[in-house]
């Protein structure tokens, strides 16, 4: 009896350790925001699972412009991934950010190095680089968008 209890306790401890190695986070991605910071640092080759739901309007007030996380079956040059549906859920890993200050005007210009990838409604993606994970909409003209996607992000802590 004592041995069985020890084995059960050991099994629970191992299960707890395995569960602790997985991080599950819910992120709201507004359709009218350029990018949403997940707060998650990833490494190159790490697999991350995404499950998204919700509806966006790619043109507020136009019911014909509604789409889910897989996007609207249209491609334009005004989107980060031109070979994927307009309005689809996408991601990027920001590798580095450089801030340059103009000596004459004093204005700061931000330049970032990032790797982009498609997500859609559900996918498992191997991270293309080490850096910070952001989620966004596959569209560059976002001022007239409405709605949001709710995205569950599951990562293995490495």
Predicted regions: what is each one?
Residues 10-25:
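Bacterial Sec-dependent signal peptides at the C-terminal "C-region" and cleavage site
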């Amino acid at each position: 009896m004592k041995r069985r209890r020890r084995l059960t306790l050991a099994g629970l401890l191992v299960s707890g350790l395995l569960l602790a190695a997985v991080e599950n986070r819910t992120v709201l991605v507004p359709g009218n925001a350029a990018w949403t910071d997940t707060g998650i640092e990833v490494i190159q080759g790490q697999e991350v699972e995404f499950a998204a739901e919700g509806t966006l309007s790619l043109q507020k007030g136009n019911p014909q412009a509604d789409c889910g996380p897989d996007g609207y079956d249209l491609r334009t040059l005004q989107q980060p991934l031109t070979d994927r549906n307009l309005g689809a859920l996408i991601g990027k890993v920001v590798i580095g950010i450089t801030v340059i200050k103009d000596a004459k005007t004093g204005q700061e210009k931000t330049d970032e190095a990032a790797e982009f990838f498609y997500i859609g409604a559900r996918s498992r993606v191997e991270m293309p680089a080490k850096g910070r994970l952001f989620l966004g909409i596959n569209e560059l003209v976002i001022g007239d968008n409405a709605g949001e996607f709710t995205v569950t992000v599951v990562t293995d802590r490495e």
